[in-house]
Amino acid sequence: MSFHPALIIVDVQNDFVHPVYISSGESALEVVPVINRLLENDYKWDTVIATKDVHPKDHLSFTTSHSSTPKPSGTVVNIEAYGHVYKQTLWNSHCVENTPGCEFPDSLNGDRIEFVIPKGSDRLVESYSGFYDAIGRDNGLKAILDKKGITDVFIAGVATDICVKETALHARHWYNTYIISEAVKGSSTESHNQAIKDFRDAKIEVISEKDPILQSVRKV
């Protein structure tokens, strides 16, 4: 049986992981050394892909984008875009294009990242998943994986309960999908734990860094 593994690094950006930038929740900087180990040359990935939130400053997922008085973070609103209406949770401003918070942390060894998938760049439409945005438009990730002949997808990054989860739930339809437990962090401990349960319920494997299937990437 063929085995063609890809590493997908989800949204490891300063606004999500670095305590200097992060405005709410817990720092997730601890996942970076784990991801760096996965990026060492003895791991024979067929490709390494990073997703990246890249929002305009007036993105409609931001609390400040709906009235002169910002709505509280966590408020759910209906957004109309291109003939679709979707529900959107509002967040504090984050990962605004051309700001330091949008960039990968300096401590991330990005030399092996072959492709970067930007998402959320349309001010009207959020995109948690690396595969599709909130109204089902294609972000281009699947085309890259299929062109590379990928069979197995290993996912790291943040947040376990949001963008990691949505990316994994899409990936499972086409690839053997694995969440590397030490390499993901949630927006809270409770939401992280619930996401791990949701992965297992969806038949997505949650593995450790030492799992034989991950170690086999070194032997491809």
Curated annotation (Swiss-Prot):
Q: Which UniProt keywords apply?
A: Cytoplasm, Hydrolase, Metal-binding, Nucleus, Peroxisome, Pyridine nucleotide biosynthesis, Zinc
Molecular function as annotated in GO: metal ion binding; nicotinamidase activity
What EC number(s) are associated with this protein in UniProt? 3.5.1.19
Which Gene3D superfamilies does the record associate with it? Isochorismatase-like
InterPro entries documented for this protein: Isochorismatase-like_dom, Isochorismatase-like_sf, Isochorismatase_Nicotinamidase
* Protein family membership: Belongs to the isochorismatase family.
Protein name, as recorded? Nicotinamidase
**Source species:** Schizosaccharomyces pombe (strain 972 / ATCC 24843)
